[in-house]
């Protein structure tokens, strides 16, 4: 399947929700990433804003994933780790999501982007300012012409309101607001991505504790079996003469090698506990981890969507796509900033020489100003070039996020398939080891 996304630097009025409404969006969300060009015109005598050339992005997506077909179990909206049905795991992940500093930082960045979006939309509403002033002045004219003229004094009081509004002729304000809102949506997707990543690290650490603890128990059983086998080997060598000293030494060496695994496993358990403590927002120490010594049953592999649909469930891919649209809107704002700006203003003031007469005289005014750049040293053109470079980088980042997502899924499926093959071999090895022990007795 080939998906072609065309990005232009002047965005249409499509909302962020139309592109990536939420995790689990339909497949048309990726196909809908194409942005239409927008030509803005003024009255006669003003030229239109040029539409930059579109960039084509082609990504070849497979029709299906290459490995494994899941059982008839859909991916639900509930937290994914609850499928293990283990209360201690649920508590561990909940503590991580409640105290992790990375996740707190992600929420802080979201609040920052929300505030930036509100600030970007402020120019769409007229601004109203109030002014109040009092002035006292003295004029000394005694040195003028040699005459002794008394000093003149005067007082002036004023009170007023001023209204200002910028007419968004070329869509600069709207484009800036759109870019900010899209960045806000992308930051919200970052929060979800951070939460998912942290939950994965927490589950991995918890499973490491359980698996290494269970393996320690298994090694303990192997040590007991090895000690029994060593006793049998020594007895055969000492009484029946059917063995050799070499057999005894080899069995002793194998037994000590098995015992040497216990400190390694204990160290891995400690490091996993430290990792879980740091993820929870605590200093690593002697924190107890409520974890069983037996691995929970694996839930069935869920049905996998086609790759193009599965990508819409990935918050990192969603965030990358939203940032492409945000960068596109920023290019539009930079282009619009190169054209004239129309400012409207109105003022209503009270003015008097005596404070008691402040409301006796009023001054009102209405003005319209057209401000446009003539010579700016190429600053605005450079800003357009910079925003276009940001857009190109965002597109490349979006492509990379898609490829990384596909690789992660394929890697996980490969590990699942090879893991099942290894389990079959280990089960056969277990059977042979049991027969070997019986024969040794």
Report each predicted region and the residues it spans.
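Terminal intrinsically disordered/low-complexity segments used for targeting and assembly
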Residues: 10-16, 20, 25, 30-98, ...
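Small/polar-residue-enriched beta-strand and adjacent coil segments characteristic
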Residues: 79, 85-87, 92, 99, ...
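Amphipathic alpha-helical coiled-coil segments
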Residues: 105-120, 194, 198-221, 228-230, 258-266, ...
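Glycine-focused motif/segment detector
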Residues: 240-241
